[in-house]
């Protein structure tokens, strides 16, 4: 529909998850220039877009390659100042890169939908290591609790991989319990 649009802020991925071909297909992570992103968003608002969906293979890495630090929170604050948008949604927030600044920005900006799309993939530390990802059930639970503490009505969306090579029935059951 004409009232919704996707705004791609970067291309590629540097995460190198063992199951994923995106880095080979799309190449290394490359942030767009923040001014170009804001200008494109202004054009979308002028055309009547009300819901803006901010996307990249890993939105939380935005800016690290160009500016030497994460810039997603700053970008979101700038997008919120654009007249016309009612809702701004952020997709594909890699769990290792979710900062307190990002959580605070999502919590504090009325236009940002209180919705976190975080591809967790699994909760078992051994499975995550074989996936070439970080964390474990404890660290992921701590992250989710931190987000819920600052954004009480947050809605989470995630993806999980079951049947990953070497996953035991016990690890599968742990994931099923975690995701419930």
Pin down the residues of each PLM region.
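Detector for the c-type heme attachment site
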Residues: 22-25, 60
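C-terminal, non-catalytic macromolecule-binding modules
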Residues: 150, 170-180
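Conserved SAM/AdoMet-binding glycine-rich loop
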Residues: 46-169
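Conserved alpha-helical substructure of the radical SAM core
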Residues: 26-53, 74
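N-terminal pre-triad scaffold of radical SAM enzymes
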Residues: 1-18, 42-46, 50-53
């Amino acid at each position: 529909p004409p009232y919704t649009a996707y705004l791609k802020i970067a291309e590629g991925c540097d995460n190198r998850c063992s199951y994923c071909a995106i880095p080979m297909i799309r190449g290394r992570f490359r942030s767009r220039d923040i001014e170009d992103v804001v200008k494109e968003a202004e054009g979308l608002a002028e055309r009547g877009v009300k819901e803006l969906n901010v996307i990249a293979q890993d939105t939380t890495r935005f800016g690290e390659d160009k500016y030497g630090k994460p810039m997603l929170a700053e970008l979101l604050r700038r997008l919120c100042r654009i007249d016309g948008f009612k809702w701004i949604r952020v997709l594909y927030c890699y769990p290792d890169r979710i900062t307190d600044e990002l959580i605070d920005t999502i919590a504090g900006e009325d236009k940002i939908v209180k919705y976190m799309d975080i591809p967790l993939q699994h909760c078992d530390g051994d499975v995550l290591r074989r996936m070439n990802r970080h964390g474990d059930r404890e660290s992921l639970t701590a992250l989710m609790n931190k987000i819920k503490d600052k954004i009480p009505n947050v809605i989470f969306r995630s993806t999980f991989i079951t049947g990953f090579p070497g996953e035991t029935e016990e690890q599968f059951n742990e994931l099923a319990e975690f995701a419930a």
